[in-house]
């Protein structure tokens, strides 16, 4: 049924009156004939007219048009047809759930209507309101008298308080009797700002008008029951003057207005049972209701078209509404029927005198045979607001309503119960079916707010096939004596066919802890499900409970009533959907094009709700249905509550507010605490019957045994729970949860099951199926349940939403609500009910807050409030916890079925999670609820229930159970567990139900609900913690998938204790123990008996590791966990750092100190079924306790010790994003994903986006994806730190647009190292559980490494870089189809034009005019280079004169005119540093480096690609050189304290030998030994070196200090990027003052750098180059020999900056621009390529195999060297041997020195990197004799003297950086140690001898003529050069731009023409160990990849190798022959396997 939207509050009353008049006119013409069957039950189609009393005092009579009877097949039709229902509904968005049916404000579901028998409605006797009742004037109308045969008339009262005026809106009460055939009566609630709500109900044969006198109705006369018992008169809270209810008979078309009078019309639905008369009356067992006066029935909505006194409604509402939601009483509304709730979310009912009148109007026939008359006592005004008449005790104590019904018929009396926060409303109703007399008592525990139970009120479809099933009106007695609010409801129309699902919107979750019929499990009401809707005060202003009443007598006079006029009002746009958000017309659609002639709104802006055709039944509803929950035009309760309340706010309303679709499907059970969002759209539209059928098909399958056993269990299986906002408000706990449900429930497939189905009717098995094998678990009986809603908590799927006014929502799918079979749980406290099978009356239920382990702890609530965590987040945490525990239970009997159920359950879980989130929000809103309610709220789910465990899911469950109806005492818990409350046990035990496969569904549903909530609910939207929510969503998704897997794995999980369960058990241990003990006996049975039901669940749980079993297992599990924990701890230790960071980042978001808790939580949940269970449980629980409960629960195997160790691992600066690191970060997660217990464990780095590891069920994944998108930033931004493949971790939440994060994590392995995240496919081994914790630590580590290597070995796409290159900003420019040429970056500067850039530079520099020069360059992409590949300068830009201070090279982006159309490529300050400083620096630096050779690095850019050029010169004494200082990428091995060198010397000088190693390798030249020895012999050499190093450091530090401000001035953006994390690695930064952007400096002395990019420089950073020129070139503009800085890919533009060609020519003429031409020059080159570093050594080592292999032994001396060596070899082409040899070659005898060196030098740094002697020694492996080489593989590297050195060793930096000038890999500090090694040994002639053999192989020089004419002739080749001068400072982005420096004709390193000091920051400076670990991994990966092919070839390498293998075939002796002979005995034999190579 489409939901009617509430009329806009702004509409004038006149307009409404006019419409009403029109409708009345129509009504007159169309009247429905009333069926009367004397023997057959007939429903009088006549519908009473609703009277609206307006504040202005105007009275208008509205004739309601008869609503067409909907066909049985259409929900809408059903809704329209019958609004009258035998049940009294609390019009609570949260809707009461009874028998699995949820009463929502929406109209009854079609199935319900179909199921109902025809009802004959006698006119009730008029009962004068007691004087006490109302001060308001009441207009008396003739009441409809009920004949004796008539069973109970249904009463409907609609009260809408005017929130703005602070007055309650008038409530129009209409009573209608409907025929079952037509369908369940449909209610429309309309909430108007000042206008009263009109609810149209089915036609009533007679209309009852109640005269109300006085504004306050203190007493309501109740009709005496057949027993003639009268309830004592009760006081009625004053009814707001505005509110009046009138019922007009059909005959009387005019609407009569009664000021305070409300008409109650009870409609008796004839019971299908053969007894047409009133036998039904007898069938109804005694039911007593205790209503807390505090329950505020501000507004009463007529349920089932029955009219209830507003006072009654308000009375009901008073108790429930105000407290929970903190909403204004005015805003509170009570929606009688779920449909109404769904249809008219905004409608507010005034319940002021409704209750009293309603009860007084009840016919005497209503007395229950053999049942005690229900006494209605007014406890006092429950409404918080003055308007709330909750205090109104509508019923006179003297008056009693006795309802006589067949035992077969289940009395379903529509009742409006106000539930005061402290009061307890209890009622017991006989259960139909096997135990017709059994009554269920629901304890509603609302702290300050009444939970609202939506029990398919008025929607309980009675299946025609079951004559017995009938609804008996229940009387609610308000008991002022009860401080606690308990509402026991046992409304279970027995429907033999099984539970019927209320109308789409009708079925709603019962927010209250009502057993809701599930308690009455013993008496299976297989017949109709009575629905009770109780609105939380906040969300639902009015609550209505309706119970279908079978009319005993057909003799009752038919009442002719005019069909209620449905006021057709213009539906309103929801304002929430995407189209509504669009403000501008598209201009393309037909409506826009025909705007002049068309009045239609743009198609793209048309509301999604309006696009849907309103259902037939929604005509009246439509007005209210489509209300925008978020729009608050006026203080209307529904809208206002939703919009005004923050997600986490105390008010549940905010949580409740969510959009409602037109149809019931769209309607969400926003406020229903347990409204199952089950098939929010699909199932929502279903009729109860359809839903019933659908639910099992969907994931939500009610536990069969349970449902059968106790149909009474309230299942919030509203198909289309469209709780009106009033309803939402009613269920305080649910609003948040309900919203979630509504939002998420749409997604829930099990929504129909969500509707409260008659649990009597439903078998527990069916119910469990609907719940996804999570048999619906009702809370323990009402005595145990503080809130009926808590009772309704689904065992596995739903957490109990406990808290004042928070009602538990049961969502059938996945909802673990106990049906009547479960009632024993409710009956935990001894109850009158026999065998405790039936829930004890709530009175008996102690209102105690949950004991230890209460699901929602104050800490959790505080966290939510203090940490600003959204309810969704908290709930998600709880859900995750619960799911982690529950998964074992969720397993289906058969794996395939389990899988399916798992997927279904996943959806259910998601919905339930959403519901939980809403409920949690409510709880948060209500501080009282925090302890209890949070979990209870969590419990509320749509049919797909997913139990969200708070910190301790079990504790949470217990708390929920305790608070909601489980006995606070352990005994009660035990009873609940034993009484077939296995689900509760599960909750107590850690909510095992979620473990069930259904949990997965629920999880997914919950996630979807969460998404919806976040997207739709203003409160949800308000949550600023979208990231956290996303994480939670991702976690939930993963959990859902995990649960799905668990379903298959549950059995395995059973063997392994669940860590979460264990944790929860700690908190809940005592309770859990009880539950556990009881639970084991429970066997899966469909019997209503509690014990049987429990066994059933126990068995199911056993499959899925039932909670009880889990609890039992927990201790052993802990032990096993401890074993596994040790393993995981080891793993965690390794990866804790990453993980901690990730968690810390998340918790920082949460505002929590220990971020790891949250990740742990994520880990823990999936772990429960899998490996992690044992690990986390043992230690983490205590730690988790510190955190908010969900975290505690979720944490799995966090070992504090490990965490501590992990914390130590890395400095916080390792990850700039996450400056804090968590101790536990390293711990791995195990997520039971994919059906495998073991899965890769994932630790997420703060930066990393967690990706779900195990693929959740499709629903779960999808929902998670949505949720992740909303909540998790699971996107690529966050990098998973690492996964430990052996254990599996359910990835989170969180980034969803990408493939579902959950699916990604589940499917793949995420490894993170130093900011690098690797996502690889999972391995079978990883997923397989090697143990509860997974494989042993060693295996886990090895797998982790392997996975990393695999990942790294794959293309770069597998690597997720922490930083991404800047991409071109989006613009609307016509960039053309081709990709833009040239790199894009703007951190140096950019502008829309060249003129703008000039202005920018002038602003920065501070001067204008000629001081600034702009030159345009064009990117060609073709590198200008000589024929040999060396740099060439085609255009040279020189300084034009002294007035020119700055030159800027800019590039114009083709076809761009945006703000970045022109970007700055290079900035050059001609006078960058003072002249004196430049002179001094040149002098001192050259002296230092000339004397000691510095530490030259061999770089890749040293040579051309062919490695044959001589650009550096051929004289080793004068060749150009490059030295690296500070902390650079090339230096981190030895120059950085993080580079594993004990004594870092970032400015180390290497005074070993003056000659450059590189040239020694090339030329084979060896310096005289005497020279080297002399240097080393000097005693004070070491002291001298130290002094020189200090001087060098001083100069460079000073220069860095001077350049930093200059850099900041000219390139502020780049500067800021480099100093953003200045506090990180502060010791590695250069500069003496704050603001240090540089970490390293490269000193190039006449060094020719071939084209390269400094790829290892920082992202979005720049390189600052300071140039120092020799004295002879400082004053001349064109020196004879110079070195230029070249941009090889750019050419000079044809015009100057102003676009003038002449200007360019003038510059060329003046010499400012020099254009070069081709010249033929004679050059030298090597005939053979110069070998890379270590090549010769390698060759020699090949001859001496042992040498290279032995190096490892030496490297073992220092593990660091080992690492470096491995890393360097892989990362750097440099061979570890080369570095090692350099050190060890010094002394062939001094192995110790070698070992020391080798450890440091292990990284294969190019020997060239070694300075002088060090380089020579290091490079000359040959220095050591072959024997030594064999002995010491490191020595195999050529020494400086050896010819091997002649081979150029490629420096690691060179190889790695590929032409990166800045990145030079200096030798490790160990090289110094090598130098310190005995030189004498090193210089031994023996060392020299090995070189000689190589001399012949040294490259030879050859002359050639360089011809580059082609380059110069073709203008497309680039080659723009700039000639820097002395003291100039150049700024460029060396990482992005290809750059080079030209060679000098005669380089002289001793007196260089140009000294270039290049300052930069390397990319890994801010990472742990400067990326050392990452490089190590890369190197290993490379090694592995390189070794693999070699291994394959190894066997065939040589005969010796074969012999070594001792291949038998090779060893066998054979005779030489000419023919082929085989050793094999058979010629055709083929050997397979590893031995095949032997034959």
UniProtKB/Swiss-Prot annotation:
Q: Where does Zn(2+) 3 bind?
A: 1371, 1373, 1458, 1527, 1536, 1628, 1970
The Gene Ontology biological process terms listed for this entry are:
chromatin remodeling; chromosomal 5-methylcytosine DNA demethylation, oxidation pathway; dendrite morphogenesis; epigenetic programing of male pronucleus; inner cell mass cell differentiation; negative regulation of cell migration; negative regulation of stem cell population maintenance; negative regulation of transcription by RNA polymerase II
Main site of residence?
nucleus
Which EC number(s) are documented for this chain? 1.14.11.80
Q: What is the effect of changing residue 1537 to N?
A: Strongly reduces ubiquitination, loss of DNA-binding and of 5-methylcytosine demethylase activity in vivo. Does not affect nuclear localization
What is this protein's tissue specificity according to the annotation? Expressed in germinal vesicle (GV) stage and MII-stage oocytes and in early embryos. Also detected somatic tissues, including brain, liver and kidney, but at very low levels.
**Quick one: where's region Sufficient for binding to genomic CpG islands?**
512-657
Q: Where is the composition biased (Polar residues)?
A: 150-168, 241-265, 825-835, 1053-1064, 1214-1227, 1326-1341, 1850-1875
Q: Where is this cross-link: Glycyl lysine isopeptide (Lys-Gly) (interchain with G-Cter in ubiquitin)?
A: 1537
Catalytic reactions of this protein: a 5-methyl-2'-deoxycytidine in DNA + 2-oxoglutarate + O2 = a 5-hydroxymethyl-2'-deoxycytidine in DNA + succinate + CO2; a 5-hydroxymethyl-2'-deoxycytidine in DNA + 2-oxoglutarate + O2 = a 5-formyl-2'-deoxycytidine in DNA + succinate + CO2 + H2O; a 5-formyl-2'-deoxycytidine in DNA + 2-oxoglutarate + O2 = a 5-carboxyl-2'-deoxycytidine in DNA + succinate + CO2 + H(+)
Q: Where does substrate bind?
A: 1657, 1960-1962
Zn finger intervals (CXXC-type)? 567-608
Molecular function (Gene Ontology), one example: RNA polymerase II cis-regulatory region sequence-specific DNA binding
- Annotated domain remarks: The CXXC zinc finger plays a role in TET1 chromatin loading and participates in binding to CpG-DNA. However, the global chromatin binding can be mediated by the entire N-terminus and occurs even in the absence of the CXXC domain. The zinc finger domain impedes association DNA replication sites and prevents aberrant 5mC oxidation.
Q: Which disease is it linked to?
A: Plays an important role in the tumorigenicity of glioblastoma cells. TET1-mediated production of 5hmC acts as a recruitment signal for the CHTOP-methylosome complex to selective sites on the chromosome, where it methylates H4R3 and activates the transcription of genes involved in glioblastoma genesis.
State what this protein does. Answer: Dioxygenase that plays a key role in active DNA demethylation, by catalyzing the sequential oxidation of the modified genomic base 5-methylcytosine (5mC) into 5-hydroxymethylcytosine (5hmC), 5-formylcytosine (5fC), and 5-carboxylcytosine (5caC). In addition to its role in DNA demethylation, plays a more general role in chromatin regulation by recruiting histone modifying protein complexes to alter histone marks and chromatin accessibility, leading to both activation and repression of gene expression.
Give the protein name, as stated in the record.
Methylcytosine dioxygenase TET1
| Source species of the chain | Mus musculus (Mouse)
